[in-house]
Amino acid sequence: MAMTAAQKAEIVKGFQRAEGDTGSSEVQIALLTARINDLTPHFKANTKDHHSRRGLLKLVSRRRRLLDYLKRTDAEGYRALITRLGLRK
């Protein structure tokens, strides 16, 4: 199911660096992680849905690129974020 505006606002509030920050790498990664986690159960039930799986893989690769950027620019923030989100390195 799609993420509601309230859920999105809650995620932004939890990961923003300053008031009104919606575009920092941390916020974008957290939002992508929430979307990925929402889509994952769909593929357990619908194993042949390859069209949507491609969209999921695009989200995962976008998150990976943002994580690589964050690791390059702010290594300590990267480590803190992956532990908060429960991601592997």
Curated annotation (Swiss-Prot):
What are the boundaries of the signal sequence? none
InterPro entries named in the record = Ribosomal_uS15, Ribosomal_uS15_bac-type, uS15_NS1_RNA-bd_sf
Q: What is an annotated GO biological process for this record, any one? A: translation
Q: Which family does it belong to?
A: Belongs to the universal ribosomal protein uS15 family.
Q: Name one GO molecular function term.
A: structural constituent of ribosome
Question: What is the documented function of this protein?
Answer: One of the primary rRNA binding proteins, it binds directly to 16S rRNA where it helps nucleate assembly of the platform of the 30S subunit by binding and bridging several RNA helices of the 16S rRNA.
The identity of this protein, by name, is: Small ribosomal subunit protein uS15
Task: Kindly give the HAMAP family that the UniProt entry links to this protein.
Answer: Ribosomal_uS15_B
